[in-house]
């Protein structure tokens, strides 16, 4: 089942998406937005966790408050994109070049902490 917000973007009804999403957080978690032109979409606060954005056109999009953990931006056009501050450039580059899932600094720290706890408890 396709989510309503996702369906609007896949059908290139960006103006309608922006009207609907203006009063709520757009739910695009785990959405397949491969190849979509999202340049005019208001995604500033969107939930894009786990979204598949391969080859999507994100040029100039403000994602500064978007939830991006687990999203993939492989081969996406990202010139001028404002990414959240908790994603470093290396993480973004790896996702663009190799399709790795994005991890924020916070989620990486939690993963490292969990690994460290396991290692420490095994000693």
What are these regions (language model features)?
Residues 3-8, 12-123:
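Tandem repeat scaffolds
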């Amino acid at each position: 089942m396709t989510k309503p917000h996702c369906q609007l973007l896949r059908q290139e009804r960006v103006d309608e998406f922006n009207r609907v999403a203006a009063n709520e957080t757009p739910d695009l978690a785990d959405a397949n937005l491969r190849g979509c032109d999202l340049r005019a979409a208001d995604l500033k606060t969107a939930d894009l966790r786990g979204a598949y954005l391969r080859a999507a056109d994100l040029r100039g999009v403000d994602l500064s408050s978007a939830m991006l953990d687990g999203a993939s931006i492989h081969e996406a056009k990202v010139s001028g994109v404002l990414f959240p501050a908790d994603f470093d450039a290396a993480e973004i580059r790896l996702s663009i070049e190799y399709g790795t899932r994005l991890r924020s600094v916070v989620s990486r720290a939690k993963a490292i902490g969990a690994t460290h706890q396991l290692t420490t408890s095994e000693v």
